[in-house]
């Protein structure tokens, strides 16, 4: 007799990593990704922008996290019927590429690059920038992320660069660009300025100890005072950058700040009154003195003598001015102004007609304008400057000052602020419009909109977009080389360049673009030449140009771009609110007056288990490929996307992969176990499951209702960009499916008759697995594919079956038959399945279950049954009473017992009690305890919290309609909770049904109950022996039990029960197939089993 097996032979201990490799091969061999795009109608699209990473390094966990999130929503929108193109992109230009090439070439600095040759250097950058592209493809593919690598865009491609040129000219024509010499964050290690937002990336601020120095400036004239006359009047200024003192040109005070006139010998020192005590030692004070006080406004306009003679004749300099940036805090209340090295300094000095001086070169070294410091790096010059100040008598105090200081995001060297020439976007001109457009964006987490991102927009500054570097898109600006005949030409296309310069442009990079020159049309002498300025674009301008750059807009694909802008969705980590998200917003607003995206997730960062940043140097993380090969990528996906990191918080992940293993064990395995159970028993019975929702069995109706609830919850969650809740819905469903539905339905699967009830059980389980495979396909794409393929597309397997008909005998669950008639429920006759029999789960449509109506009454009742059972089992565990040990009774004390009575036999069987007692007199067993939601209530009533806490402990409160009265206030439902608290003399009690009902287990064990418990233990021992002997679930066996423990009474009373449960007969004197030794009540038992 042949046994037809319709499903794969599935191992309960699956090799998930190997399984995933098979799925990846299936996708590749059948071109499933492309089919998922081609099969969708282009009229309904989900537009997704893939932020371009640098390819000159391997992907890290942050990249994988972002990739998982991108993949989830792309897959989900696909099964929702949307066409989702996923074009990958590469960020190729900028400092990361240049620094890597400098390292590999063994050169450093702009001069060294120029000597090496710009053409050769950029050629090396071009070759090295895609060094890890193949590795990226391996990692991305292995994580089951679908992207289009073949048609990827690169910011170094000529077409992309041309779109950047177009954007620049558009901004220029709109009057949104200007050139200026302004103070900016400056990386002397990279010899380039940085944007303000670049100093906010990747925790660029580091704790740093600097020497802070207090110096005295000698006033040129006396200060009007009643204190008396002094030989000198000196005003004290404090700075953490002594190296800027040689460039001092002014001092700033606060107009409304009080300044003390502090005499010491024949000198009067002027210092903010709030700072006097900090300088008591240096000024020889006892602390008892009183000083004359003047306002800062009285110091305005006073002249002082320059500290050094480098710029002593600089026009309009060495005066005291009022500055609104001078506030009480650190220092002396006096700020020294070096307009070449401070933003506030420059603004104030320019307003007073003081031109800046900047005696520091591109490498952060002093120039010949400071002869005695020439060639010295500015930070190395601090000590020499302090020594000079001491020699001159201008020094008062030096101290170590520890503060957070910005560092270069590429070299980790401390930045300086330095005046450099640059081109700027006038962001301040349209920042209010950006704030308005931001309100059209759905941010996840929500608070990012008006806080992290919104505040940044409100305080946006003009953006420096030019860099004096080499490898990047060149600024399309040509200037006359003769100031007598000034002219500026800005180009926005290759066509414009070719027209004016009369040559074919094949490469827009330096040095080729620099070679384009022509006579200045505005020079009648014909001697001056139009030459391109040397600067290239800030690479953030290029990544912000991604939406149109990838399409070569407006030169090609004009209609396509207009249909694909803005994006429906983007995602990156939270610091990109100062990076990519910001530059997208700036350029989108300036060029199109539209937000660049409509939905945006800002996820958090991944750290090691101690909270440290993941680092090769610290060796504190595992190679992701190792985790994939060990546990599979679905497990890592779930670990990350079910955590708070998707809500912008941190995720701490261990190096050994224990978290991922736990996910495999607690999330992936339960899904697989349900599938394994179905295939094993369906093959054993030669039955096929089918999508069918017409069963009237109460457990079927319940689990199908729970299925639809889960499917709807997943859909609702992913519509709201909430993977956490979606994963919870999956986990919660399989918890009920495995530990309730399958376990309570085993009798139906095990029985020998292939009747309608048995087929309904298979159909219901099949329907659950098939439907969930589709619903969760975006969340666990590979295990979903494996289950779907196994259910839908396996070939029939004809194996030789064991002789004889399956005569599995199992206990009958009569409680369900009773419940069917006791609970009203509505059942539709069929399931509407709006999808074809696709070869891949990722080509299906999301299930709607529109023809099946949830039985909410049954769900509520059955959920209470589960609650009762789980609480009862918890009490058993707490009291160390094993589940196989019967108990006399359970008392259920509730106002809603009628529905529960229909499930009495089920409750008795599940928690192993002999009787269920129903009561409704809760007041005799429990009291209600008030639990305050302190964070919630504290926001509304902070001034009454102490009073409310005292009253809650005393029980001085009253439940009223719509809330709770306490201390003259009415608490809202989310500000408190009433918890049932059993009286202290009651044992074995627990609340259920949202703290509205109570259960009490009778924990007393009689001799009869103990004896029955032993019988159940014996059944378990025999079942384990069957499993260890590798017997089939249908095999009948012989059993012999040898023990010091007297089992005769147990065998006499419970022999039939034991034989029925184990498909066995008691026998002696046979040669066993398997022998096991177990222990019962400290007695050794030997079990012998043999196939009969």
From Swiss-Prot:
Keywords assigned by UniProt, alphabetized: Aminoacyl-tRNA synthetase, ATP-binding, Cytoplasm, Ligase, Metal-binding, Nucleotide-binding, Protein biosynthesis, Zinc
Cofactor entry: Zn(2+)
Top-level division of the source organism's lineage: Bacteria
UniProt xrefs under InterPro entries: aa-tRNA-synth_I_CS (IPR001412), aa-tRNA-synth_Ia (IPR002300), Anticodon_Ile_ABEc (IPR033709), Ile-tRNA-ligase (IPR002301), Ile-tRNA-ligase_type2 (IPR023586), M/V/L/I-tRNA-synth_anticd-bd (IPR013155), Rossmann-like_a/b/a_fold (IPR014729), tRNAsynth_Ia_anticodon-bd (IPR009080)
Record flagged with keyword RNA-binding: no
Gene Ontology molecular function terms on file: aminoacyl-tRNA deacylase activity; ATP binding; isoleucine-tRNA ligase activity; tRNA binding; zinc ion binding
An individual GO BP term: isoleucyl-tRNA aminoacylation
Signal peptide: none
Membrane-spanning intervals of the chain: none
Binding site for ATP: 616
SS bond partners: none
Catalytic activity as recorded in UniProt: tRNA(Ile) + L-isoleucine + ATP = L-isoleucyl-tRNA(Ile) + AMP + diphosphate
Any one of the GO CC terms: cytoplasm
Record motif 'HIGH' region, residues: 53-63
Matches recorded under PROSITE patterns: AA_TRNA_LIGASE_I
Listed EC numbers: 6.1.1.5
RNA-binding listed as a keyword: no
Family per similarity comment: Belongs to the class-I aminoacyl-tRNA synthetase family. IleS type 2 subfamily.
Complex and partners: Monomer.
Recorded domain comment: IleRS has two distinct active sites: one for aminoacylation and one for editing. The misactivated valine is translocated from the active site to the editing site, which sterically excludes the correctly activated isoleucine. The single editing site contains two valyl binding pockets, one specific for each substrate (Val-AMP or Val-tRNA(Ile)).
PANTHER family, A to Z: ISOLEUCINE--TRNA LIGASE, CYTOPLASMIC, SOLEUCYL-TRNA SYNTHETASE
Protein name (Swiss-Prot/TrEMBL): Isoleucine--tRNA ligase
Source organism of this protein record: Rickettsia peacockii (strain Rustic)
